[in-house]
Amino acid sequence: MSKLAGHRNVAAVTRSALSLSFVAACVALLSACIQNQPPATLPGTTPTVWTGSPAPSGMLGAEAESMGPPNIITRLNAPDGTQVATAKFEFNNGFATITIATTGVGHLAPGFHGVHIHKVGKCEPSSAGPTGGAPGDFLSAGGHFQVPGHTVEPASGNLTSLQVRKDGIGTLVTTTDAFTMNDLLAGQKTAIIIHAGADNFGNIPPERYSQVNGTPGPDATTISTGDAGKRVACGVIGAD
């Protein structure tokens, strides 16, 4: 055999060895990528390629929760301490979404119930109002909440009424841009109150109704309270 032929054979063997080494390396790399993967459930499919370590348990839920809008959840109780409803305040895009849901049945009478934010974060049964007077349930929560600089009616804390069904269950979802989360939590905080009756929102047309003294339209009490009656459930916003 000539020296030239010998050199050619050696080169061919070297190339073959390198090719086999390259193929073996690829196979090893592919095996490392797909090891411990569950078998495919459909014929002709391959396992999903794994791209990293699994997230710690609960991480995805925690991240999803942290990405949600800021919110406050408040429990509303009757004067005897029985929970009547929950209220969730969510703040996003410059407005608040309030969701109120009754808990249990029989705590609220069927029909409409006025709902307001009150200006003092207190829920004391048989208490006097901030300016004194005869005691009553949750009177220490004061009147309807007004944000700083807002003095006209409807008050900043006026909300849509809650309608309770015949079975004693009710749900309300309403929105407002009349206050922010900081407004509700500032200073002495605020309270959300459900009343015994419906709120007329001071809608007493003067061309149809007059006060007992002959003055047309609603009086100051109707304008400020909506004639919604007793306070039957209360929750301090931000207390939970």
Swiss-Prot record:
Catalysed reactions, semicolon-separated: 2 superoxide + 2 H(+) = H2O2 + O2
Signal peptide feature range: 1-32
Primary location: membrane
Cofactors: Cu cation; Zn(2+)
Binding sites annotated in the UniProt record for Cu cation: 116, 118, 195
GO MF entry, a single one: superoxide dismutase activity
Origin: domain of life: Bacteria
Disulfides per UniProt: 123-234
Keywords: Antioxidant, Cell membrane, Copper, Disulfide bond, Lipoprotein, Membrane, Metal-binding, Oxidoreductase, Palmitate, Signal, Zinc
EC identifiers of the protein: 1.15.1.1
Sites of N-palmitoyl cysteine lipidation: 33
Lipid-anchored residues (S-diacylglycerol cysteine): 33
Record localization: Cell membrane
Mode of membrane association: Lipid-anchor
Cofactor details (free text): Binds 1 copper ion per subunit. Binds 1 zinc ion per subunit.
Function of the molecule: Destroys radicals which are normally produced within the cells and which are toxic to biological systems. May play a role in favoring mycobacterial survival in phagocytes.
Assigned protein family: Belongs to the Cu-Zn superoxide dismutase family.
Protein's recorded name: Superoxide dismutase [Cu-Zn]
